Design a protein with these regions (language model features):
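Active-site/ligand-binding loops adjacent to catalytic centers
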Residues: 3-19, 69-161, 205-231, 235-238, ...
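Active-site/ligand-binding-proximal alpha/beta "capping" segment
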Residues: 9-74, 148-152
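Short, well-ordered secondary-structure micro-motifs
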Residues: 30-31, 62-63, 94-101, 200-202
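Buried hydrophobic positions in well-ordered alpha/beta secondary-structure cores of metabolic enzymes
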Residues: 38, 50-51, 83, 117, ...
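Beta-strand segments within the central parallel beta-sheet cores of soluble alpha/beta enzyme folds
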Residues: 48-53, 78-86, 185-191
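Short glycine/serine/threonine-rich phosphate/pyrophosphate-binding segments
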Residues: 54-63, 91-94, 165-173
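Catalytic phosphate/nucleotide-handling subdomain of diverse soluble enzymes
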Residues: 170-231
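Low-complexity, intrinsically disordered Ser/Thr/Pro- and acidic-rich segments
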Residues: 240-242
């Protein structure tokens, strides 16, 4: 929040074009390509439900705009795609507004591990609310524990290590399905927007530490075979003092 405010003040004073703040039209229009790529990867169809993490609010309304432009151009069928906003419970000003039926976003002080989406006063929050309303979607939030559990679930089932924004999206999608807002048998796009390497500290303490072994093939085989018998993955640190790990 403070950085966005400062960048806006700098742009006003010096006439500079700071590309990664919400008030730059070229930046926000560029976010539509995310929606275009979703349609392309779906074989030029739209998912019936798209869940997007919300920070400053730039991406979600532009995904919705991308969908509407594709529909108007006749490139995809209008299947009434719904858009959902996903936020951390410790910073959920947009979701709170959606639930309350308000257009006004009330700023919050972020308290969450999901730092990349911890924007307490989102500049484009109003447009997120409008896109969600127009599409017939909803807003959902997830606790820090739910976010971590979702990160682990995605890694275990899909081999994808996401940072907390993606964990938030998955956790919120699960809750939307369980609450009946998203049918289980319809197409769902879960937006995973960041790599877990950005926030390694989030999962530290939530996973088993690696087993250290000497740099011997027999020692490695023993650990792997033991893990296979137990039906578990085997994190291994090879060699004394080594930071190499093999799943």
């Amino acid at each position: 929040d403070d950085v966005n405010r400062l960048c806006s003040e700098i742009a006003d004073k010096y006439g500079w074009a700071i590309v990664n703040v919400n008030l730059r039209p070229f930046y926000t229009e560029g976010a539509k390509t995310f929606g275009f790529e979703i349609a392309e990867q779906y074989g030029w169809k739209l998912p019936q439900h798209t869940v997007v993490p919300t920070a400053g609010g730039t991406i979600l309304p532009k995904v919705y705009k991308a969908y509407q432009e594709l529909i108007k151009l006749g490139l995809v069928e209008d299947n009434g795609p719904k858009i959902y906003s996903a936020q951390a419970a410790g910073c959920n000003p947009v979701v709170e507004a959606i639930r309350a039926g308000r257009d006004l976003i009330k700023p919050q002080k972020p308290r969450t591990i999901a730092k990349s989406i911890a924007i307490g006063n989102p500049a484009d929050g109003f447009y997120v609310v409008q896109a969600v309303k127009q599409s017939g979607g909803w807003g959902e939030d997830a606790t820090d524990d739910e976010i971590v559990d979702a990160i682990k679930l995605l890694a275990r089932t899909e081999g994808i290590w996401t940072e907390p924004a993606g964990g938030t999206t998955l956790a919120c999608t699960i809750k939307l399905i369980e609450s009946g807002r998203i049918p289980r048998d319809e197409s769902i796009c879960v937006s995973i927007t960041g790599n877990g390497l950005k926030t390694v500290e989030v999962v530290q303490g939530h996973l088993e530490p690696p087993t250290s072994i000497p740099a011997k093939l027999a020692a490695f085989d023993a650990v792997v075979n033991g893990a296979r018998k137990a039906g578990q993955a085997a994190p291994v640190a090879v060699g004394a003092g080594s930071d190499f790990a093999a799943p």
